[in-house]
């Protein structure tokens, strides 16, 4: 099996290169965290140790979830190969091992390079936090390395990626029609309904817990119950994952009906996205989850520190945001870059067909920009719905405490920043592959 994994990796290494941005940044985050923790423990700097721990905990968890989007797209790219393997007698378990083995191999190569650079990164990250919080909170720290930290840094990301790749590829291959195209999907439909029902129940439970706290009129209980908003953010992410790409496809059709146009850029962009639901789900899930997570966390922390009259509330909110959210945000953005690169490799055949039909490179580039704008509009619409719920709940908590909202910039700023980055990265990446193809 190991030889087969290596041979298959060599055969498809061009496609696997698209995963480098996500794996490289993941290895930087994990390495920075491990070197920082080891150095902080050595000098008994408890505060610094906790800050570095947050990177690996939240970064590792985010990486595990993001792997599913990359796996889904890779399986779609290698669909014909896996169908051939299935005809030759390969089982779902063997195909899952083949996918996870290649992902693990790629992750080991990239992590080895990332570990070296993360040692330098750890010192820069700590100095940045030190300037933000002050030397009283974070005294000087000398970053050191040992064999244990280096080995863990090299193999933690491949381990997370390998386990995640096996889990998600097994699940996706079971749900998809790659192995048995004519098999009915009744069990999948029932499982999906149960999945959504459980998440909806948890969502209603969170909303009910927050609203009911207002009837108690006890400040301590209200402040304690308000932390459920953070759990609600996780539920929102899971709901987005469950509803994608159905909700995005509905919105595309809805927009096409409301704003009918004869512009070839917009029309072709709409139909390109509808024809590739696998990629639509992958990039929309990542970006919508990211925007929802960032906006919700900012809205909650900035206003809650103010509600509780915390000294240096803005400073603490920024520190919390960096400690808890920096790793997930960076990973989500790099995951989107990886997904765009992977999809661009797949687009090469479509580009050749369109060129044969007489479509110029400039026209194709305009279509790609149109796709980027449509992606951005969809992300904005989905995130606004969930952000509005968080905004209303935070405002309600403020009313319970006799306060009003201090800052609502988190409702719109992250969305504009993230979708602007998406348009730029999407256009550059797609444009690059467009102009290098012959």
Per-region residue spans from a language model:
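Long, hydrophobic alpha-helical segments
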Residues: 54-70, 323, 327-334
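Selective transmembrane-helix segments that form parts of the transport pathway or gating/packing helices
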Residues: 13-19, 99-117, 154, 192-203, ...
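Alpha-helical transmembrane segments, especially those used as permease/efflux helices
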Residues: 2, 6-8, 14-36, 152-167, ...
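Hydrophobic alpha-helical transmembrane segments that constitute the membrane-spanning cores
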Residues: 25-33, 102-126, 293, 297, ...
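Short helix-loop junctions at transmembrane helix boundaries
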Residues: 37-43, 114-149, 210-227, 300-311, ...
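Interfacial "coupling" helices/loops that link adjacent transmembrane helices in transporter permeases
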Residues: 65-104, 334-373
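Short cytosolic juxtamembrane segments of multi-pass membrane proteins
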Residues: 3, 174-190, 434-438
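Short helix-terminus and kink motifs of transmembrane alpha helices
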Residues: 69-76, 119, 123, 127, ...
């Amino acid at each position: 099996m190991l030889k087969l994994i290596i041979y298959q990796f060599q055969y498809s290494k061009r496609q696997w290169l698209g995963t480098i941005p996500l794996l490289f940044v993941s290895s930087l985050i994990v390495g920075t965290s491990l070197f920082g923790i080891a150095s902080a423990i050595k000098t008994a700097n408890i505060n610094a140790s906790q800050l570095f721990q947050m990177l690996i905990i939240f970064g590792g968890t985010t990486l595990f979830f993001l792997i599913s989007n990359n796996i889904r797209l890779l399986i779609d790219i290698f669909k014909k190969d896996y169908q051939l393997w299935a005809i030759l007698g390969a089982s779902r378990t063997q195909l899952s091992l083949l996918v996870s083995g290649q992902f693990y191999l790629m992750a080991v190569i990239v992590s080895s390079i990332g570990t070296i650079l993360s040692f330098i990164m750890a010192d820069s990250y700590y100095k940045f936090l030190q300037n933000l919080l002050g030397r009283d909170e974070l005294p000087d720290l000398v970053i050191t390395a040992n064999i244990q930290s280096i080995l863990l840094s090299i193999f933690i990301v491949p381990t997370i990626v390998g386990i995640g790749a096996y889990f998600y590829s097994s699940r996706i291959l079971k749900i998809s029609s790659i192995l048995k195209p004519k098999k009915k999907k009744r069990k999948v439909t029932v499982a999906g309904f149960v999945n959504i029902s459980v998440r909806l129940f948890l969502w209603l439970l969170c909303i009910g817990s927050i609203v009911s706290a207002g009837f108690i009129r006890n400040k301590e209980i209200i402040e304690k119950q308000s932390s459920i908003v953070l759990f609600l953010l996780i539920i929102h992410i899971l709901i987005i994952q469950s509803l994608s790409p159905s909700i995005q496809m509905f919105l595309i059709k809805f927009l096409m009906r409301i704003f009918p146009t004869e512009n070839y850029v917009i029309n072709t962009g709409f139909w390109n996205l509808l024809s590739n639901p696998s990629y639509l789900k992958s990039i929309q899930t990542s970006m919508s989850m990211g925007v929802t997570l960032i906006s919700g966390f900012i809205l909650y922390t900035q206003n809650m520190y103010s509600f509780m009259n915390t000294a240096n509330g803005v400073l603490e909110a920024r520190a919390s945001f960096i400690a808890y959210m920096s790793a997930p945000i960076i990973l989500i953005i790099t995951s989107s870059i990886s997904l765009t690169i992977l999809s661009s490799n797949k687009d090469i055949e479509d580009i050749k067909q369109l060129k044969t039909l007489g479509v110029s490179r400039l026209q194709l580039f305009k279509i790609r920009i149109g796709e980027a704008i449509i992606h951005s509009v969809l992300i904005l619409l989905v995130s606004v719905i969930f952000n509005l719920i968080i905004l209303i709940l935070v405002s309600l908590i403020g009313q319970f405490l006799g306060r009003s909202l201090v800052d609502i910039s988190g409702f719109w700023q992250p969305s504009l920043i993230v979708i602007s980055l998406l348009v730029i990265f999407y256009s550059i990446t797609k444009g690059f592959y467009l102009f290098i193809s012959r």
